[in-house]
Amino acid sequence: MKFWQLILVLFISFIVGFSTNVFYENFKLKGPNEDQAKFTAFLDEYWEYVIDQNPTFASLLGYEGYDDKVSSNSISEFYKNRDFEKYVIDVLEKINPESLTEDDQLNYRLLLLSNETDLESRSFPGFYMRLNQRGGVQDYYDLASRLKLESIQDHRNWFERVKSYSQNVKNSLDINREGLEKGYTQPKHIVRKVAEQIDSMTSKKTEENPYFKSFSKLEAMNSDEAKKLLAEVKEFIEDELMPSYKELSTFLKNEYIPNSRDSIGLSGVPDGKAWYEFKARSFTTTNLTPDEIHELGLKEIKRIRKEMEDVIKEVEWDGDFRSFLDFLRTDPQFYYETGEELLAAYRAMAKKIDAYMPTLFNKFPRAPYGVIEIPMETAPYTTTAYYNSPSAGRPGYFYANLYKPETRPKYEIPVLTVHEAVPGHHHQLSLTQELENVPNFRKYSGFTAFIEGWGLYSEQLGESMGIYDDPYDKFGQLTYDMWRAIRLVVDTGMHYKDWSRDDAINLFLENTAKTQLDIENEVDRYIAWPGQALAYKIGQLKIMELRDKTKESLGEDFDIKTFHDHILSFGSIPLNVLEEKVDEFIVENTK
């Protein structure tokens, strides 16, 4: 799943920039004395400022008045965030949570935890290491695909945003130059990819530039006003926006890359090991150390490998494990010739899974979803699939990578669809957004371990749905389970144990049927995004543990549909809180 794309939002988490002084005064003036009333008012004020200072986020949620604005990516915004988080913590510590309703005690706990975690993250200079191939200043244009661009005014608003992006590109250059001076850089390998992405965009003719193409509906309007606006857009892209991108690319190639680090792990920057230990805790919502996570990954690899070998015996393969993997990677029967065929297969699988959903759930979201292709501008650099949740009347979308279909095996289609669409992220995140009597900060942010743990858990639900209806599809599911187990090993290996990129790639090649291109893109993702890949398997194992615990406790009274509805009814929560809620469920349902 792609994290901007997820969209800065899925909104697994969001970063906000606040004009805090005004907020403080407003809150002091409005805040009642009683803790319950004060907390309720604080939630409202908090959300108002989240929206006010995050115009892109506001637009995606359908709030009016923000469609021509963007947030700054400057260092000063980073410090505003820090000041606001300190203030939120200060306000919450003056409220007695025991005086709140049971629901608000949970809201209080989650809001405090989120801000404490965000504040701790600011003890590390993450703003110097934002550059990565998965998204950033180089693909701001992608936002247009999530906006309503129908009228001339819609396009005029979008143009105002595009004009602001030029300053953000310049800010990126300044921030990365400062990071270079202080020894905080992304690895050479990652930044080369970013420079390639920028050069790919700036080398296009204006008519083929993704920014210009985002205004394509203006041409069809065929009015003088539309023609004038389109001419202004063209002039700005050619005279200001692309030159700012070219300047950034030149800086990256001539100054940044030659002087950035060769090491790929976070341990290669000052205080990098402590930084990674924090990331491991925050992404998994546990106190597991990198060493403990590494060992857990090795155990899971051994367990899953045994299941994979059982499938190989079932198909009566007469070679060894490695030769079977080579067979899956290279035999034409496992691949479509065109992207159109691949997309049609994903859509057919989604419809098939939809029919099975009532066997596992009682509650369903109102929001629909679709299956569409990842834009070709970013497809070569990104992973196999990702999901973007519904926004402002727009459906949720499962994005499938159609680039080089000869590297996208058919046996991945079932497992990817259950993870990204239903019963995975679309089902989960749409239900979260539709929760009633839950504050907005819980509807549109969350904890990666639960979100991605549910996605991986959903892959196993495909077994009971019968969608792995031949051994190769089952091997595909096991490959994806193995993939997440290997993540525990390679992520900790690269960022904490000085593993090389080749070490990580080879572990994948030896144990999964994923293709070379997929593996390389995945490993590069882990290099650019330390710690995030740990969340999937840790979350999945906890959900499975809690399901088994509930089933054992309730015996014949256990109902899988009720259990699933229950654990999704709180939105995205830390794993320890999830366990508390399951324990309460067991007590309430024990006769």
Predicted regions and their residues:
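N-terminal maturation segment of proteins
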Residues: 3-5, 9-591
